[in-house]
């Protein structure tokens, strides 16, 4: 799903809107959902999304590092998620779901900016990592806001299955 969507978006944006710097991506959304449900496995959509984006855009090797390594910075949220799980269990509220989305987006884009700096990018170009992702940011936050209402979507998978088992035992 990720690879097909990214391919369609890249094809459409380069053909129909070649002068526009904006794009939309599923990577932050999938990363966030997988991060909540399965933890470190969120690295897979982060890496695959970065590799695929770079491949489709004909990027040079340093850009592969920027996107693949930069996309992984939100993994730093794993200790926070562990403590949140113990206290709350899920991200079913509006503020927690959107707040987590904002944190993932900022860390992902900040990670790309940081890796770019390490490769010698001009610091004046760094705001572009945040501004070109505006459509992706809005898309991610709106979908997370919707997903929070679906039972178990923004909940640790083990916690969700245990909760279901307990609910079935009570009924």
Where do the model's predicted regions map?
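Alpha-helical transmembrane segments and their membrane-interface exit regions
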Residues: 31, 71-80
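Hydrophobic transmembrane alpha-helices
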Residues: 1-37
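Alpha-helical transmembrane segments of multi-pass integral membrane proteins
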Residues: 1-6, 38, 100-109
């Amino acid at each position: 799903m990720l690879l097909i969507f990214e391919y369609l978006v890249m094809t459409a944006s380069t053909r129909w809107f070649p002068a526009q710097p904006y794009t939309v991506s599923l990577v932050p959304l999938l990363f966030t959902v997988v991060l909540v449900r399965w933890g470190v496995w969120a690295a897979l959509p982060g890496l695959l999304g970065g590799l695929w984006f770079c491949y489709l855009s004909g990027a040079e090797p340093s850009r592969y590092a920027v996107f693949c390594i930069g996309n992984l910075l939100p993994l730093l949220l794993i200790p926070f998620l562990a403590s949140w799980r113990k206290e709350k269990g899920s991200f079913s509220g509006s503020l927690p779901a959107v707040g987590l989305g904002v944190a993932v987006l900022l860390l992902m884009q900040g990670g790309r900016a940081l890796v770019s700096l390490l490769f010698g990018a001009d610091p004046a170009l760094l705001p572009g990592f945040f501004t070109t992702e505006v459509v992706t940011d809005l898309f991610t936050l709106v979908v997370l806001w919707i997903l929070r209402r679906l039972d178990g979507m923004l909940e640790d998978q083990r916690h969700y299955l245990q909760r279901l088992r307990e609910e079935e035992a009570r009924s």
